[in-house]
């Protein structure tokens, strides 16, 4: 409800009159009462709401993904004309969007499945928007979407037509998977700095402030530096009294499931999903901590040197995560005939969304230099960083393993990097085993 309200207010602020409807009369009245003088027109029946709109109608749905979306669409259909446009801005599974697009197209309606990132504040002030569906329908709503979207530093709106049917929601799903990876990498950097150097919260804030001034500059690093110094009403550091169980809404899981369907090695992001799952086993972990043995973390040596190693490991880990995510976008584009523009996708992530970061411009540059590049690690800039930073990533992972600090995504990053640069892997033995017990055959070198 808050996302819908804030998007309505964002659209209204650009000079539009916006018809609003909610199943709950109270919620509709509440939005109007809280925003006096705004060009928001309340409606209390679906029929009245639909008939208030100019044709072709442009209806933005912001409802909980799943059955609720189908129910909302079904309630609208009796009052729609051919050519009307429904925009689903929810966190919808892309296969549902493909189905709805197919069904509504058959009835003469347009359907645009649209990823919206930026949370409640982004919805109000300018989100990153990822629309997919009929191109001609997108052209009719593009002027509004371009006005309400976030603006990158160069003034470009963070919205672009992504591709047919479920493409927009797929890109949003991968965005969310990358977000999981970014957050887990940062959490592991925090664990290393705390475990290896016993940095105080103030020192952590200072470190992250410095990091945010360089190549790691991003929304997530920016908010993390603030989190470290936030205190609760008792004067305790808030981060230290928050239970170490990370929840999830399932979008990271969808990204990993899709990687398995496509045969894509999305190892880092998948480890970040599993890290949340193992965090939720709090009671088991507490019990296991009293039974299972392992090393106690020893000091990591020179402070400045170790902080720099962790910074480098974090940046290279982030690059590996994005390389995997964009590789999966390429596989999905081929599978679903979307013809995705990867440089354009990186561009619309530059502002408004949770993963916004300075280095996204480097991804856009890489695809502009070579649109057909198989993997971002092969692009000149990222190859140079990998050359310079891979040793730091190795050192950090080795330290973590020797000292019993779990770093699943840092470990996944170096394992993927080494696997990807290996001309020969031991998979020949696996294939021989498969042939031995199952006559699966094999290819000779």
From Swiss-Prot:
User: Alphabetically, which GO biological process terms does the record hold?
Assistant: D-gluconate metabolic process; organic acid catabolic process; pentose-phosphate shunt
The family database entries (Gene3D superfamilies) matched by this protein are listed as: 6-Phosphogluconate Dehydrogenase, domain 3, N-(1-d-carboxylethyl)-l-norvaline Dehydrogenase, domain 2, NAD(P)-binding Rossmann-like Domain
The record's listing under InterPro entries reads:
6-PGluconate_DH-like_C_sf, 6PGD_dom2, 6PGDH_C, 6PGDH_Gnd/GntZ, 6PGDH_NADP-bd, 6PGdom_BS, NAD(P)-bd_dom_sf, Pgluconate_DH
Q: Does the keyword NADP apply?
A: yes
Identify the PROSITE patterns for this entry.
Answer: 6PGD
Residues recorded as binding NADP(+), renumbered to this chain, are: 1-4, 22-24, 63-65, 91
- Where's the active site on this chain? 172, 179
Q: Which GO terms describe its molecular function?
A: NADP binding; phosphogluconate dehydrogenase (decarboxylating) activity
**UniProt keywords, alphabetically:** Gluconate utilization, NADP, Oxidoreductase, Pentose shunt
Q: Which pathway does it take part in?
A: Carbohydrate degradation; pentose phosphate pathway; D-ribulose 5-phosphate from D-glucose 6-phosphate (oxidative stage): step 3/3
Per UniProt, where does substrate bind? 91, 117-119, 175-176, 180, 249, 276, 434, 440
Superkingdom is: Bacteria
Query: Does the entry feature the keyword NADP, yes or no?
Result: yes
**Which family does the record assign?**
Belongs to the 6-phosphogluconate dehydrogenase family.
Q: What does this protein do?
A: Catalyzes the oxidative decarboxylation of 6-phosphogluconate to ribulose 5-phosphate and CO(2), with concomitant reduction of NADP to NADPH.
Q: What does the subunit section of this Swiss-Prot or TrEMBL entry state?
A: Homodimer.
- Which PANTHER family does the protein's record reference? 6-PHOSPHOGLUCONATE DEHYDROGENASE
Q: What is this protein called?
A: 6-phosphogluconate dehydrogenase, decarboxylating
Q: Which organism is it from?
A: Raoultella planticola
Q: Which gene encodes it?
A: gnd
């Amino acid at each position: 409800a808050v996302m819908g309200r804030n998007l309505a207010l964002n659209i209204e602020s650009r000079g539009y009159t916006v018809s609003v409807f909610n199943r709950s009369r109270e919620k509709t009245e509440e939005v109007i009462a809280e925003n006096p003088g705004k060009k928001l027109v309340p409606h209390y029946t679906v029929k009245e709401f639909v008939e208030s709109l100019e044709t072709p109608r442009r209806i933005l749905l912001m409802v909980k993904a799943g059955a609720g979306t189908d129910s909302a669409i079904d309630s609208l259909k009796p009052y729609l004309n051919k050519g009307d446009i429904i925009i689903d801005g929810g966190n919808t599974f892309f296969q549902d969007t493909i189905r709805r697009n197919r069904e509504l197209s058959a009835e003469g309606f347009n359907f645009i499945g649209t990823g919206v990132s930026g949370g409640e504040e982004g919805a109000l002030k300018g989100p990153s928007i990822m629309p997919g569906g009929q191109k001609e329908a997108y052209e009719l709503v593009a002027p509004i979407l371009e006005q309400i979207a976030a603006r990158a530093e160069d003034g470009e709106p963070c919205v672009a037509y992504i591709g047919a049917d479920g493409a927009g929601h797929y890109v949003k799903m991968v965005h969310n998977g990358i977000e999981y990876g970014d957050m887990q990498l940062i959490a592991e950097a925090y664990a290393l700095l705390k475990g290896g150097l016993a940095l105080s919260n103030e020192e952590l804030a200072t470190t992250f402030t410095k990091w945010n001034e360089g190549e790691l500059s991003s929304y997530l690093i920016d908010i993390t530096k603030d989190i470290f110094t936030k205190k609760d009403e008792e004067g305790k550091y808030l981060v230290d009294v928050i239970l170490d169980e990370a929840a999830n809404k399932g979008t990271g899981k969808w990204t990993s499931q899709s990687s398995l369907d496509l045969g894509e090695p999305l190892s880092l992001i998948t480890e970040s999903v599993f890290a949340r799952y193992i965090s939720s086993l709090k009671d088991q972990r507490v019990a296991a901590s009293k039974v299972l043995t392992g090393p106690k973390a020893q000091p990591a040596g020179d402070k400045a040197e170790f902080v720099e190693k962790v910074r480098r490991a974090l940046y290279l880990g982030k690059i590996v995560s994005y390389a995997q995510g964009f590789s999966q976008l390429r596989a999905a584009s081929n599978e679903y005939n979307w013809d995705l523009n990867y440089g354009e996708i990186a561009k619309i992530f530059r502002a408004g969304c949770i993963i916004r970061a300075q280095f996204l411009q480097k991804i856009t540059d890489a695809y502009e230099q070579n649109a057909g590049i198989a993997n971002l690690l092969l692009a000149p800039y990222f190859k140079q960083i990998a050359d310079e930073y891979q040793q730091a990533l190795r050192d950090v992972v080795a330290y973590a393993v020797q000292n019993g600090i779990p770093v699943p995504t840092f470990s996944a990053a170096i394992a993927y990097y080494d696997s990807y640069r290996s001309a020969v892997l031991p998979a020949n033995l696996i294939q021989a085993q498969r042939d031995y017990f199952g006559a699966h055959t094999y290819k000779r070198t």
